[in-house]
Amino acid sequence: MAKEKFVRTKPHVNVGTIGHIDHGKTTLTAAITKYLSYKGFASFVPFEQIDKAPEEKARGITINITHVEYQSEKRHYAHIDCPGHADYIKNMITGAAQMDGAILVVAATDGPMPQTREHVLLARQVNVPAMVVFLNKVDAVDDQELVDLVEMEVRDLLTKYEFPGDEIPVIRGSALLALEANDPNDAAYKPIQELIDALDSYIPEPVREVDKPFLMAVEDVFSITGRGTVATGRIERGKIRPGDEVEIVGLSYETRKTVVTSVEMFRKELDEGLAGDNVGCLLRGIDKDEIERGQVLAAPGSITPHTTFKANVYVLKKEEGGRHTPFMKGYRPQFFIRTADVTGEITELGNNAEMVMPGDNAILTIKLIYPVAIEKGMRFAIREGGRTVGAGVVAEIVE
């Protein structure tokens, strides 16, 4: 049970550290909590505690994630850190812990490395809106010009993946020196404060789900004699009121418009249903056989049906309950997209690969046998014979 009530006085923002292995992500996370504990804005979480991240399950995949929380003068932050590279890939693809912004940690001693690139690419594909950079281990580099070069390299990398590389704040410091310091006025903490200020000013405040256009995936449909057809489901975003017009999207290229005449929850009528509510929507002029599970109700024009898309996919290892063998082009598993369960064919493997192995992270082109409401950045699961074999995120709509 929760020990204390979460008091919502400051805006809440989800962030996380990303970057190459051993560049100092976990050390930085610990240093932030230590510094802010002196200000009464956090509890210090030591390195060892963050490093032994507990297991979580998301979409049938086990992921190790540590969550810490801290505050600045202006905001409340939930911060995630993952111990292993594979955990980052899995987290970003499954969306187990969403990020409103990321802290890219790059060691000045190494510069950008393969996982740095991979994490930045993933952040772009899963729509992480903004990023700040912490250039770590600058105390270990004697030549200031080298640090300048590394910063230029990082900015170029960010620009390459369509982040505003020229304007992203880059903070230089040493997470280890900060973690070892015991006085909040120690010079080693100055970069930590600069980082917090950068988060406050540069990571935009997230748009609350309730302020986005209405969308509800249809879970079940039934008819009420004399009243009409009711579609039930959880409102993913936005809000719905009786009298609102919605579109039924998916399963064909034609979308149908209808009006929600009543919104009900636990058999009581609501003035409005909000993001997160499980509701039933009574639909005007729709027969029970004209709407089914797998479609969505959405604000008109806010989402369209598609069959073909590119996705970044993590394929489960055998030990994770996934496939024991690789798959090639032409593989036809089931795709679980919101409430839709649809067969699809993998028509292209990225990087001209011959096959995809269990444990791989790959870019695939997928063609579904019928259209589904899809948008960039949305998550899905891949299943075969009743077990999850992969998880993906839509990177680009093809048609």
Curated annotation (Swiss-Prot):
Residues that hold Mg(2+) according to the record: T26
Region entry G5, spans: 174-176
Domain tr-type G as annotated: residue spans: 10-207
Keywords from the UniProt entry: Cytoplasm, Elongation factor, GTP-binding, Hydrolase, Magnesium, Metal-binding, Nucleotide-binding, Protein biosynthesis
EC number: 3.6.5.3
GO cellular component: cytosol
Broad class of where this protein is predominantly found: cytoplasm
Any one GO molecular function term: GTP binding
Region (G4): 136-139
Tree of life domain: Bacteria
Annotated spans, G3: 81-84
Residue spans crossing the bilayer: none
Annotated catalysed reactions: GTP + H2O = GDP + phosphate + H(+)
Residue numbers spanned by region G1: 19-26
Region (G2): 60-64
Localization, UniProt: Cytoplasm
Subunit (UniProt): Monomer.
Function: GTP hydrolase that promotes the GTP-dependent binding of aminoacyl-tRNA to the A-site of ribosomes during protein biosynthesis.
Similarity comment: family membership: Belongs to the TRAFAC class translation factor GTPase superfamily. Classic translation factor GTPase family. EF-Tu/EF-1A subfamily.
Name of the protein described by the UniProt record: Elongation factor Tu
